[in-house]
Amino acid sequence: MGLANLSFLYNTLVLEHAKSPHHYEANLPTNGHQITLHNPTCGDTINVSLQIKDGYLNDLCFNGSGCTISQASASMMTDTLGGKSTDDAQKLIQGFLNLCMGKPISDELKQGLQDAAVMGTVAEFPARIKCATLAWHAVQDILNQQK
């Protein structure tokens, strides 16, 4: 892996989200839904908390530790999914997972992913796919438990 490829993965937007993650809470709220997921490959741990009220995701936040990619992706995930309906959140999550696997997604879905669309670059770095998708899988797991 060349240095040019690494700079493609660790672009300015990713580094900004990792350095100052949005919706990061040292102490997660105890009400609502919570889940913790681990990525043993990289050592990432993500704790996600959210409330579902009237079919919408509210108070979406996270904490945890891990690599730059996992922390940046979790930050982007909270920006993207917060306030969305559960149906829209599921579509965005699936679109994000497809993007990270190198599968094509619609321009509309890519636009809906906001900053998170830059994470599509992890498709070229298979070892980083789990890092990028961990927080998204956490919310997906919570939503699937609600069905």
Question: What are the roles of these predicted feature ranges?
Answer:
Residues 73-85:
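Alpha-helical support elements that line or immediately flank enzyme active sites
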Residues 42, 69, 124-127:
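Secondary-structure capping and boundary motifs in well-ordered enzyme cores
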Residues 65-71:
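Short, thiol/selenol-centered motifs that function as redox-active sites or metal-ligating centers
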Residues 1-24, 86-147:
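C-terminal binding/interaction regions
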